[in-house]
From Swiss-Prot:
It comes from Nostoc sp. (strain PCC 7120 / SAG 25.82 / UTEX 2576). The keyword Metal-binding applies. The lineage of its organism: Bacteria, Bacillati, Cyanobacteriota, Cyanophyceae, Nostocales. Its EC number is 4.2.3.4. The gene is aroB. Zn(2+) binds at residues 186, 251, 268. One of its GO terms (cellular component) is cytoplasm. Belongs to the sugar phosphate cyclases superfamily. Dehydroquinate synthase family. This is 3-dehydroquinate synthase. Keywords: Amino-acid biosynthesis, Aromatic amino acid biosynthesis, Cobalt, Cytoplasm, Lyase, Metal-binding, NAD, Nucleotide-binding, Zinc. It is an enzyme of class 4 (lyase). Catalyzes the conversion of 3-deoxy-D-arabino-heptulosonate 7-phosphate (DAHP) to dehydroquinate (DHQ).
Length: 363
């Protein structure tokens, strides 16, 4: 079953195609976009081994001249040094303004390829072909690109929308279990912030911790409803002037935890799971949310095999200090996304360090 979701933007609208066994059709998909002939396919070694040949063959069969380059996997490689390597390859292959970078991989590859495309020759085409659940439902959509700074996540970046997003659910079969669980954090997030029906469907599933235990129709719903939620929010607020900030639910504390553990201890989705538990409890303590709903959220996070406690030995004061570097800080105040009911959230700067400390000490 193929689903097409439109991301409608004032500048450049595009399609998200969710189609099983579609990776070998990528050349045809791109041929219809009237792009230049030169393509740089960026991946990581593991993903390229699984899917690189299929993608390259398809692109070449459609008449594209394809160069490929693999960057190391992992958040700690999401740096300007890696971007420099992509610039070198772009120069070597004489990429032009009409050329395209194709990101074949998870969130890290997508973010870096998008940023390289945004900045090479002041902006060339990028196409996202996400291979992890997290990238499929979140990072490949919406045009946020960037790299990490030693003192904070995604502090260096640009908004650069893709020309097209191709999601082939069958590639999830090769995804390690821990990566699948990390992606489920973003899916649960959409249920809490936007889509109560998705939340209910997740509650009805006996297990959420491994792809093979989830019914195919729920996998379809997870992908289509999550992508639709992201497309709806981005379509209303492309550059995070207001509404789009809700997509950062769980990310405020989550990013601080990732940064303090040097991006080595936790997957992004695991940190987001911890961040959602923290944000949910802050909302309860501020009497914005019912404890029963927070418990329902936490039960889903646990059912997805995600952590709900802070890593042992993490300095709580360090987390509170790191929050000041969050991108959502406005006039020196940390802005938190907090739920008010399942499917509805609010953004507030009324959360004090004491509120945060009180919750984190219980985690």
């Amino acid at each position: 079953m193929t689903s097409v979701i439109n991301v409608n933007l004032p500048t450049q609208s595009y399609e998200i195609a969710i189609a099983p066994a579609s990776l070998d059709q990528i050349g045809q998909s791109l041929a219809g976009l009237k792009l230049g002939k030169k393509v740089l396919l960026v991946s990581n070694p593991t993903i390229f081994k699984h899917f690189g040949k299929v993608a390259v063959d398809s692109l070449e069969a459609a008449g594209f001249q394809v160069a490929s380059y693999s960057l190391p996997a992992g958040e700690r490689y999401k740096t300007l040094n890696s971007i420099q390597k992509l610039y070198d390859i772009a120069l070597e292959n004489r990429l032009e303004r009409s050329s395209t970078m194709v990101a074949l991989g998870g969130g890290v590859i997508g973010d870096m390829t998008g940023f390289a495309a945004a900045t090479w020759l002041r902006g060339i085409n990028v196409v996202q072909v996400p291979t992890t659940l997290l990238a499929m439902v979140d990072s490949a959509i919406g045009g946020k690109t960037g790299v990490n700074h030693p003192h904070g996540k995604n502090l260096i970046g640009a908004f650069h929308q893709p020309r097209f997003v191709l999601i082939d659910p069958q590639v999830l079969k090769t995804l390690p279990v821990r990566e699948f669980r990390a992606g489920m954090a973003e899916v649960i997030k959409y249920g809490v912030i936007w889509d109560a029906e998705l939340f209910n469907q997740l509650e009805q599933s006996k297990r959420l911790d491994q792809l093979r235990y989830i019914k195919p129709e729920l996998v379809d719903a997870i992908l289509t409803r999550s992508c639709q939620a992201k497309a709806d929010v981005v379509g209303k607020d492309e550059k995070e002037g207001g509404l789009r900030a809700i997509l950062n639910y769980g990310h405020t504390v989550g990013h601080a935890v990732e940064s303090l553990t040097n991006y080595r201890l936790l997957k992004h989705g695991e940190a987001v799971g911890i961040g959602m538990v923290a944000a949910g409890q802050i909302a309860v303590n501020l009497e914005l949310w019912q404890q029963a709903d927070a418990d329902r959220q936490n039960a889903l996070i646990e059912k997805a095999g995600l952590p709900t406690k802070l890593p042992v030995g993490l300095d709580i004061e360090g987390i509170i200090e790191a929050l000041q570097l969050d991108k959502k800080v406005k006039d020196g105040k940390v802005r938190f996304v907090l739920p008010t009911q399942i499917g509805v959230v609010t953004v507030t700067d009324e959360v004090t360090s004491d509120h945060i400390r009180q919750v984190l000490q219980q985690m």
